[in-house]
């Protein structure tokens, strides 16, 4: 049976017994006399026990009794200590003594004692001092809620133990410092031994790893070096951790209890304010709204408790007045209820009113919390629906946009493809028509040449017949002449010799004529074939071509003066060049630690020695180099040289420059130069490519800047092998 049920049962029994009691005057007088005969200590004990049950504050749940003593003892402190009401309170305490001996109520008192609210129970053992101390503690509160220390279960003994732990921790820390000061040799010996062994292991491992890495391929070594650097860092961290653990027993553990207790106390003091210091992020907005509403509900409950306390004070004053009137009436000889019956009646009324108020407060609180939760759920559901609608709308818009972009892209690509196809088809048709015309002309010329070649034997035969027809007539005329003429004739042998010589001359002449006609035909045919793209050369032409090629090669392969040649007096202004790209390949290392890297300076681009790898590389696809020429000239062209694809290990030259610009400067200190031209290097073309300036009138310059805008796709660096500048001297 609960406490409320027992009290109601007791009150009903008292009411039934009160009908047969004696007169109120005698009972009141007797009871008052009995009470005033008690000792002061007994009176205070009964008052403390009665104040514990006077007016419990309204609370939710089973913890409502833990805050009872504040309201009861504050009322007693303000109104009832030393008043006639103490007599009535003593009687009610006698009626409720059997309730305090029950296990349920004693368990509740133990819980209150742990929270710092069981002052009345401790007063039974300590007397007046404990009771006054409990009254002072509860009267100092302002809201009916216990402090954070009371809720956490802190007592004076706990504070004393934490202070002793702090003092012991400080003493152990001082002893550790004193040990370090008085005995430093041991500490430094351990530290030196640990550093020496660690360094020996580190250098040995680095040497072995260096040998292992250098015997592997380049890519494998790079990946392995990265992994080993990471492993070395991990080893260093492990060594530091081991060192900290090694020195841990020497005194670091003395600081742990003090730090832990201080941190726990700090966290317990800061715990109620955590929700106020959090950032109002989107993720915790709902939780913060619930917390704020719960706190507002707590403030309302505090206000309601204050109102209930004030009403209870008013009811107590009115009850006191009623008792005084009743006592006066009893002394006057009138017949009325006894004092005990009146007290039982009033206490039953107060308990019923208290139960009603608690039930109403519980219902109102539950209804209010349910309304708040329903509102929060509705808001959360509405926010979720709005967010889902927005997401769906955004996804639909993005899908529509993507579909529109796809259709636009398809239409644009189809139109562009059709336009390019039509243009390409027209160009091919025009080229085909021109080729047909040229082929027809070539066929006609070939037929005419064939006809001329076919007529050559007939011409030779006609010439021979003409000679044979003319020779007998000459002989006949010579033989029929006079003797004087015959005396000048040669002998037969001489005549045969003359005839043989004449025949040789005729054959030589005919051969020359045939060769001349053949050369003319071959020359005309070669010109025609050269126009059509078919090259047919003779041995003489081959010799001439080879001779010209060798001469061009001896003339620096382009046959133009290079005013940017370093051996001719040109130089690179290194302070106005891009940063050189480091290859990260160490030529000199110690225990795997690189000490010196090899890298080419910008001077390489002014030197004629060109072979793979002997170039100047700068970081990224963009860079520049400023060159002072050997003389002031009027620039006409520039030449850019790169290694061919056939000499590249990967058969690609993605590090070659693509788009570049040439600027001219009047002096070294000039910040911005004059743009002379913008060109593009073709990676599929010749290794040496010359670019001519289009300006008709060019000023004279002695400082030229080569500015690389893009390369052919290498993301890390760009290479320049040789740069030349051509022009006319200013004088």
From Swiss-Prot:
One of its GO terms (molecular function) is identical protein binding. The modification Phosphoserine is found at residues 12, 39, 55, 120, 123, 147. The disulfide bond with SYNE2 is required for stability of the SUN2:SYNE2/KASH2 LINC complex under tensile forces though not required for the interaction. The disulfide bond is proposed to be conserved in LINC complexes involved in force transmission. This is SUN domain-containing protein 2. It comes from the Eukaryota. Signal peptide: none annotated. It is a single-pass type II membrane protein. Keywords: Coiled coil, Disulfide bond, Endosome, Glycoprotein, Meiosis, Membrane, Nucleus, Phosphoprotein, Signal-anchor, Transmembrane, Transmembrane helix. The gene is Sun2. GO terms for biological process: centrosome localization; meiotic cell cycle; nuclear envelope organization; nuclear matrix anchoring at nuclear membrane; nuclear migration along microfilament; nucleokinesis involved in cell motility in cerebral cortex radial glia guided migration; positive regulation of cell migration. InterPro entries: SUN1-5 (IPR045119), Sun_CC2 (IPR040994), SUN_dom (IPR012919). Residues 1-128 are annotated as: LMNA-binding. Changing residue 435 to A: Disrupts homotrimerization; disrupts interaction with SYNE2. Residues 569-730 form the SUN domain. Residues 396-452, 486-519 form a coiled coil. The proximal coiled coil domain mediates trimerization required for binding to nesprins. The distal coiled coil domain is proposed to dynamically regulate the oligomeric state by locking the SUN domain in an inactive confirmation. The coiled coil domains are proposed to be involved in load-bearing and force transmission from the cytoskeleton. It comes from Mus musculus. Pfam families: HTH_SUN2, Sad1_UNC. Residues 18-33 have a biased composition (Low complexity). As a component of the LINC (LInker of Nucleoskeleton and Cytoskeleton) complex, involved in the connection between the nuclear lamina and the cytoskeleton. The nucleocytoplasmic interactions established by the LINC complex play an important role in the transmission of mechanical forces across the nuclear envelope and in nuclear movement and positioning. Specifically, SYNE2 and SUN2 assemble in arrays of transmembrane actin-associated nuclear (TAN) lines which are bound to F-actin cables and couple the nucleus to retrograde actin flow during actin-dependent nuclear movement. Residues 1-69, 106-142 are annotated as: Disordered. It is found in: Nucleus inner membrane; Nucleus envelope; Endosome membrane. Core component of the LINC complex which is composed of inner nuclear membrane SUN domain-containing proteins coupled to outer nuclear membrane KASH domain-containing nesprins. SUN and KASH domain-containing proteins seem to bind each other promiscuously; however, differentially expression of LINC complex constituents is giving rise to specific assemblies. At least SUN1/2-containing core LINC complexes are proposed to be hexameric composed of three protomers of each KASH and SUN domain-containing protein. Residues 521-731 are annotated as: Sufficient for interaction with SYNE1 and SYNE2. PROSITE patterns: SUN.
